[in-house]
Amino acid sequence: MSEEHPPIAEANSQPSNGCPVAGGRLNYPVEGGNANREWWPTQLNLQILKKNPPAANPLGEDFDYAKAVQTIDVDQLKADVAKVLTDSQDWWPADFGNYGPMFIRMAWHAAGTYRVGDGRGGAGAGMQRFAPLNSWPDNVLLDRARRLLWPVKKKYGNKLSWADLIVFAGNHAMDTMGFKTFGFAFGREDRWEPEQDVYWGPEHTWLGDERYTGDRDLENPLAAVQMGLIYVNPEGPNGNPDPLAAAIDIRETFGRMAMNDEETAALIVGGHTFGKTHGAGDAGLVGPDPEAAPLEQMGIGWKSAFGSGKGNDAIGSGLEVIWTHTPTKWDNSFLEILYGNEWELTKSPAGAHQWKPKDGGWANSVPMAQGTGKTHPSMLTTDLSMRFDPIYGQITKRWLDHPEELADAYAKAWYKLIHRDLGPLSRYLGPLVPKETLPWQDVIPVSETNVGADDVAELKKQVLASGLTVPQLVSTAWKAAASYRNSDKRGGANGGRIRLQPQAGWESNEPDELAQVIRILEGVQESFNAGDKKISFADLVVLGGAAAVEKAARDAGFDITVPFTPGRGDATQEQTDVESFSYLEPTADGFRNYLGKGAQIPAEYKLIDRANLLALSPPELAVLVGGLRVLGANYQGSELGVLTDRPGTLTNDFFVNLVDMGTEWTPSPADDGTYVGTDRATGASKWTASRVDLVFGANSELRALAEVYAQDDAQEKFAKDFVAAWVKVSDADRFDVR
């Protein structure tokens, strides 16, 4: 894999979009201007809850990609990709006559944006096609790789997404170069607009590193050391060529992508077995990135004025490194060369720090990218980390003597890399999916549930008669289901992991209260399962929430059935990676008025972020907050935002009382971030509320929604809309039935 990032074309040191205010005037909307954002830069951004609208999808709402992709002749697809690999094009010649290493890097950098902290990034939607990723310094020259694949995409059309093709091409490239990959799953569906909801960092310049505080503490959830890089700076921290310091950055950033030390070492060693980097000349001769490039370049950026600008004259990262004498073949030569030499610091023709063998060792032993010339092997600072860091060194030294262990470790680490954001196994499609499952895949056993409609009705009665209250049942079902995050399709009620560690111990889940509810629900399950019919614990948690919502609706005068789809399985503690699942723990849950310690942004912003991870629309966000308040589902039974005198009843009282101008809101004397609502006429205290509650009256867009649900004719509509949104969250992880 080639590793690129310009030091970087100084001619393009600013993000290509620049400042939206030019020449003292606001830009036109078609120029990227957003007047509201300029006037009120901290305004809540509800647009992220309206992303990927059906109108933007040229394939139409009825197109079923999961069905279409499974009609592909995968053997023919392999042959078509293999043909592209060695069909060198004059406009961008293949290094060593093979585009394979370039495609590996393309796939790596598509998948490698994933971070486990919030599940965002990754290859799952083909985002490498769009800004900012298509113009990140670390993705220099990958625009060519995607264009080289266009004939394949053109042939297969809508049956093969760019998201799948980008990753498949890199995976199959290794198969053609003598490496046995672990497997491959299709199922990544393209999106048609850039992701505007991913926080890539605070910097305004490429390669900025304002994300650090203190003694190099990296801001969460970021998983790269500088703006525009995938992981680390290959020259070393901020260009400091110190392999041991670089190892610290490597461990931090790869760890934030859920990779352990062995997986990290395998990816670096295995990936750098292939290809080269590009730094043949002065990086100042490199033109603007794709988003800033002239119209006539048709989306191809980084045009170089050095020599021919391609082949042996190519400039990408500014590093000019060829690792091995067999750059298009899988073998153990990377480690043999890494350990077979002592290394001295040098600079590439572009002025970037890299390493070469001391005393002219291994001269003329590796091929040039083009022609018959020879040169010496080189290494990146981060490559030397694999030898000189004590932990990585112990691992790679073992692989030097046991290359078969490296091959196995790399195959599984690569498979994890390119599938980490694909979600549960029910989303893995195609004939190349391996039968073996791995711990990070959040395995869920087949459900034992076999209930019919009459059984469901009887179970609802039993749950409501168990002594559990509406707030207990609602909050427990919510805690289970709302652990889902749509970014990487992890979490949710399926698996019943609400009763397992780490979820059972999360502060937001109120462990003591939760343990009591679980004990009672398990008793109901045990009693019911003593007969011929069975229900899983995961299903029972969701069913209990449904029963409670139905009761609350009846108490409000509405006979509403909450749809329930059985079929959830129960995972075991042994099937649950505690460390990996710990990243799903919410730091805030505005739906239950929970705010953990150390929040970096105010609670109302955290609410929008959580709604986004749940794939909710603004109206769904509104009805869920309003409904959960009146149902009494708050954290620790708090009265904040419970704007009703009939809690436990599914009414629109939250909105009615929130927009009532007869109430005056002031900050609480306790100075704890809460507010007190008093009667304007009498001064009597009426309510208490949080920032999350008041934002539905203060923010103009959210108030517009609140007013709809506060109207006299909205009571039944509110109840029905709440149920629809509730079911959406309850079933968010049910990819097995949709």
UniProtKB/Swiss-Prot annotation:
CDD domains noted in UniProt: catalase_peroxidase_1, catalase_peroxidase_2
Residues the record marks as site: Transition state stabilizer: R105
Cross-link (Tryptophyl-tyrosyl-methioninium (Tyr-Met) (with W-108)): Y231-M257
InterPro entries per the UniProt record, alphabetical: Catalase_peroxidase, Haem_peroxidase, Haem_peroxidase_sf, Peroxidases_AS, Peroxidases_heam-ligand_BS
Cofactor: heme b
The UniProt record lists the keyword tRNA processing: no
Cofactor binding mode and count: Binds 1 heme b (iron(II)-protoporphyrin IX) group per dimer.
Keywords (A to Z) from UniProt: Heme, Hydrogen peroxide, Iron, Metal-binding, Oxidoreductase, Peroxidase
GO CC terms in record: cytosol
Binding annotation for heme b: H272
Top-level taxon: Bacteria
Region (Disordered): 1-24
Protein role: Bifunctional enzyme with both catalase and broad-spectrum peroxidase activity.
Subunit structure: Homodimer or homotetramer.
Protein name (record): Catalase-peroxidase
Originating organism: Mycobacteroides abscessus (strain ATCC 19977 / DSM 44196 / CCUG 20993 / CIP 104536 / JCM 13569 / NCTC 13031 / TMC 1543 / L948) (Mycobacterium abscessus)
